[in-house]
Amino acid sequence: MMKFKPNQTRTYDREGFKKRAACLCFRSEQEDEVLLVSSSRYPDQWIVPGGGMEPEEEPGGAAVREVYEEAGVKGKLGRLLGIFENQDRKHRTYVYVLTVTEILEDWEDSVNIGRKREWFKVEDAIKVLQCHKPVHAEYLEKLKLGCSPANGNSTVPSLPDNNALFVTAAQTSGLPSSVR
């Protein structure tokens, strides 16, 4: 299903959730510093770059496109961290890990809307995100709890849509760390 808005097309899955994609953009493969961008609605707040998927677009491609537009970075797309559900906003977001290899001086959102970007230590990013975007903080919490390459745990495999791993705020607390 698709809905058209001026200069954007929104796509939805079978259950009516908006299909989104995002990346946790790391400065290095150690995944200790993450790039956040200023919110377009609240420029003094920080968010994880991401947005709606376009028709026929694969989640990984959408995630790479969104970080290029919003954060002005290119990089090596890594693993799918999970698919996060936001029941309030009716969104499902595919969240990937990306290691930044190129940082543009000027990029689409910096020129058009004055968007900023900044590197944060993961712990600091979680604190910043918990106030304004707790769902985004969950991405980093999940990374810390079981998907970091530094802790020896296995990574979450990419799954086809019909076998997708969905994580909601209510579900994470009771799950073993190997699946959070």
Curated annotation (Swiss-Prot):
Primary residence: cytoplasm
Name of the protein in its database record: Diphosphoinositol polyphosphate phosphohydrolase 2
Positions annotated to bind substrate: 10, 18-20, 39-41, 89-91, 115, 133
Binding site for Mg(2+) 1: 50, 70
PROSITE patterns: NUDIX (PS51462), NUDIX_BOX (PS00893)
Keyword Hydrolase (UniProt): yes
Subcellular location: Cytoplasm
EC primary class: hydrolase
MF terms (GO), sorted A to Z: bis(5'-adenosyl)-hexaphosphatase activity; bis(5'-adenosyl)-pentaphosphatase activity; diphosphoinositol-polyphosphate diphosphatase activity; endopolyphosphatase activity; inositol-3,5-bisdiphosphate-2,3,4,6-tetrakisphosphate 5-diphosphatase activity; inositol-5-diphosphate-1,2,3,4,6-pentakisphosphate diphosphatase activity; inositol-5-diphosphate-1,3,4,6-tetrakisphosphate diphosphatase activity; metal ion binding
InterPro entries, alphabetized: DDP-like_NUDIX, NUDIX_hydrolase-like_dom_sf, NUDIX_hydrolase_CS, NUDIX_hydrolase_dom
Species assigned in the record: Homo sapiens
Gene Ontology CC terms: cytoplasm; cytosol; nucleus
Gene: NUDT4
